[in-house]
């Protein structure tokens, strides 16, 4: 059983919802990522999504694109991201870590380091799941099986526009949780319509038996609390990155802890 599945089972037993913060690895400073991850856990994060910097992130809005550009300028790529996870695992062996990114860096990693090397290296580093935005579920059965053999999960996005066929395809290969993108468009865009999310989640659950996390557009504790009434997990990314942009090194971790503690308190209320 994966760390992600174990975490969600424990939360369900306790009647609690998962808090999943997202941060782009290597943003805003290259060396701060492991400390930031530990701070997130201290504040009540249940799973951490770590964005892999990429030069052409088609699903990301301006905030996360800018963070990715900064991380790349800081010299951070997939090799360094795995190093951050290894460092995090020296002190924390329980909190799941999901890498979120695109196919290109993964495929380049295997070209440079050897066929299927990325999965082996990610498992060895302590990664628990992958969310590869541009991997189509209908072509991922072998890859998903390869991950499951290493107790890793393959996570997929669903959107307001997702068809029944898409949901069924995702249900066949996904494990850990699915990530419902609550807005049309890119990350960080628009205002969240909680009623629309409430209407969509039962449709998803007709086809998907694993937990459903909701993200894109969750910017404060009140919205997170409203979404948590219908979702199994709340994902917050762009708001954290906006908050940290331009802040000095010494404020990065305390600001993140303070913000996430407020969200955690709202989820547990």
UniProtKB/Swiss-Prot annotation:
Protein name: Tryptophan synthase alpha chain
Pathway: Amino-acid biosynthesis; L-tryptophan biosynthesis; L-tryptophan from chorismate: step 5/5
Pfam families: Trp_syntA
Highest taxon above the source species: Bacteria
Family statement: Belongs to the TrpA family.
Active site positions: 49, 60
Assembly with partners or alone: Tetramer of two alpha and two beta chains.
Keyword field: Amino-acid biosynthesis, Aromatic amino acid biosynthesis, Lyase, Tryptophan biosynthesis
HAMAP family: Trp_synth_alpha
Molecular function terms from GO: tryptophan synthase activity
Enzyme kind, highest EC tier: lyase
Stated role: The alpha subunit is responsible for the aldol cleavage of indoleglycerol phosphate to indole and glyceraldehyde 3-phosphate.
Gene Ontology CC entries for this record: cytosol
Enzyme Commission code(s) on record: 4.2.1.20
Catalytic activity: (1S,2R)-1-C-(indol-3-yl)glycerol 3-phosphate + L-serine = D-glyceraldehyde 3-phosphate + L-tryptophan + H2O
Species name: Delftia acidovorans (strain DSM 14801 / SPH-1)
């Amino acid at each position: 059983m994966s760390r992600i599945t174990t975490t969600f089972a424990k939360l369900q037993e306790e009647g609690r919802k998962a808090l999943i913060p997202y941060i782009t690895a290597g943003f805003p400073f290259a060396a701060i990522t492991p400390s930031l991850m530990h701070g997130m856990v201290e504040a009540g994060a249940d799973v951490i999504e770590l964005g892999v910097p990429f030069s052409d992130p088609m699903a990301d809005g301006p905030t996360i694109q800018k963070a990715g550009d900064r991380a790349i300028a800081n010299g951070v790529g997939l090799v360094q991201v795995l190093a951050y996870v290894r460092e995090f695992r020296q002190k924390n062996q329980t909190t799941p870590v999901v890498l979120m990114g695109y196919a290109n860096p993964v495929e380049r990693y295997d070209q440079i380091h050897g066929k299927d090397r990325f999965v082996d290296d990610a498992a060895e580093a302590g990664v628990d799941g992958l969310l590869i935005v541009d991997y189509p579920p209908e072509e991922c059965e072998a890859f998903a099986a390869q991950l499951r053999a290493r107790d890793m999960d393959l996570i997929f996005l669903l959107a307001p526009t997702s068809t029944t066929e898409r949901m069924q395809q995702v249900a066949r290969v996904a494990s850990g949780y699915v990530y419902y993108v609550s807005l049309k468009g890119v990350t960080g865009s628009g205002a969240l319509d909680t009623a629309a999310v409430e209407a969509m989640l039962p449709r998803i659950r007709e086809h998907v038996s694993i937990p459903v996390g909701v993200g894109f557009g969750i910017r404060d504790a009140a919205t997170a609390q409203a979404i948590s009434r219908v979702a199994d997990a709340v994902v917050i990314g762009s708001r954290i990155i906006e908050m940290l942009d331009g802040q000095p090194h010494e404020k990065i971790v305390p600001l993140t802890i303070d913000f996430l503690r407020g969200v955690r308190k709202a989820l547990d209320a």
